[in-house]
Amino acid sequence: MATVVAFHAHPDDEVLLTGGTLARLAAEGHRTVVVVACSGGLGRGVLADPETRLAELRASAARLGVARVVHLGYADSGHGPVLFPDPPGQVRFVRADPGEAAGKLAALLREEGADLLLSYDAQGHYGHRDHVMVHRVGARAAALAGPVRVLEGTAPRETVALLFTPVRALGLVVRHDLVAMRAGFTPRAAITHRIDVRRFAAQKQAALAAHRTAVYGRGRAARLFRLVVRLPVPLFGLIAGREWFAEPGARTARPIGDVLQAAGPAPGPGQGTVRR
């Protein structure tokens, strides 16, 4: 059996990006660990009690069969033009020493004997500064710890842009969100793993519902979350029943359906292109 560590920026990210994959791994008998960099105090556009958000994370993780939850100790950096001062006794993640943060994560990877680290793509999905930092710290920690194999949690850029068009029409996002989505995530051709998690849709939806601060708060994201957690499970599974990853330095003829299966190296110069 394998040990898989999922490194995320904030509480609720573990559901949105890897919830079904974590539930599937746990059901198959593997050990799963969730590590969050930040406490969630600036999550989803609302000020929130960090301890409440971390408690919600633990409840979510339990619904996904996660064996252990760890907070690295950093505060949220927020998403937007303003970077707030550090709160008392904490450092905002984007201001953290990357080497120190990577050292903390590497120590945990060694302690767990991790076989795989789930991290983030280089764009930080839609450009969130904490998500970009997760990518940098995750890559460095994996190298320090072994190295440990890495998969970057992401989504096909083309699919994200397509889905956000009707969501924007419903008033749930604004223009700059759509622009960020079109420039973020990962091009479809670079996706190496596509995981079918439709059998775990009920668990994933229940885990999202555990994040009550995010679901019942204010703002566009909360309205969207409330809509999603109330969907019939088959419809939720249709929308959120696949999760995507990119393996750095690898390329596949078609996406692999198991995160524990490694992709082959990308073709070098003069070796042709991969047909998808």
What are the residue ranges of the model-derived segments?
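Metal-dependent de-N-acetylase/amidase catalytic core
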Residues: A2-T3, P85, V91, R95-R276
